[in-house]
Amino acid sequence: MHKRLLILARDFNTAQRWAKEQRLSPGQWVYVSAFYNIQGNAESEYVLLDNWLERPDANILAETLETSRCVESERFRRSDIL
């Protein structure tokens, strides 16, 4: 199992543009909608990234996204997230 970068962004196109700028290949990153939460309810786009990073269910979120088969992660630096 290899690690992928989770890119938290307001839409897929924004995440894809940022990933291309970082020279990431498609298999190296996964888009995470800033509007998504574990319950599946809409949230403000102004997600508090620090709070999101500290959530113990962040790995569950990554594993349940349709765009991700499997994401293994311990912790993400703030600079890793759009």
Predicted regions: what is each one?
Residues 1-82:
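Short, flexible loop motifs at catalytic/binding sites
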